[in-house]
């Protein structure tokens, strides 16, 4: 398995891009807001964009090394790059699109293209043109074309952004299977936390031009560590906080003291609670830990859950978000949060 080593800098219009990470096998996600440098990172790895300094290596091969004056063209990098738009050739058939990226003799190219069409269930569409294909079919053609070349590394840039929401879930299952069969390093760029969670073993959170957090995907959602990571993984409730005990923090924007199941660091600047982690509490219970009296501000009912905006009734400050399953017919007077579900965050 070839190790991808990335360590480069590039000055962008609004901020410097400094990317440093290693990847070896599996599927890795880069989660970040629009404009943070995700796509530019991909372009540098693929050879479409040129860094100002640093190096990019894949195994023992230098794809880019400013000091050694190495900058391989895209066709020599063995990097498969799936663009957001899929970048199919509009005047070529499905068969021709897949065959176009394959090197070798005509008979071998034809055989490989037919093999990939069968694998991706495209044989019946062989003579069709991209304009007549659905978004899901276009994605399969683009992926078949890339994998037909047997790349050493696969880059997927927002792979589902061009698809209708009802198609995404089915295609995510398909893609997960294709990536498993690919068996080499895949990196997915996305701002969609659900895509990242479903597909990626490890996730890197990107701020403006740098990787801020890198860890196992499930661990990232459990303990995101940084405010930006908490927001990008879907945490609606984030308050400024200060330590007020070994296992206690005061959430300044909510006016409530919270107990956690671990020691509170002096570096903590914020605290987070996911909207699904509030649970109804009994007002008469002696268990007062992390119990908050509810003053409802607004509520919205969706087909399968409620979204409720509420304040701490005894010290009303900023709103908090709570989500409840539709089976709960009444909004609770009190809610409670498990100490282990509270997120301790740094700016």
Where are these regions (language model features)?
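C-terminal boundary and immediately downstream tail of ABC-type ATPase nucleotide-binding domains
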Residues: 221-244, 270-272
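ABC ATPase nucleotide-binding domains
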Residues: 78, 93-228
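ABC ATPase nucleotide-binding domain helices that frame the ATP-binding cleft
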Residues: 39-42, 141
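The short alpha-helix immediately C-terminal to the Walker A/P-loop
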Residues: 43-44, 202
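Catalytic "switch" loops of ABC-type ATPases
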Residues: 48, 76-79, 83-91, 192
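Conserved ABC transporter NBD signature motif
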Residues: 54-66
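Non-catalytic connector elements of ABC transporters
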Residues: 2, 6-33, 39-40, 47-50, ...
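ABC ATPase NBD coupling module
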Residues: 63-80, 104, 220
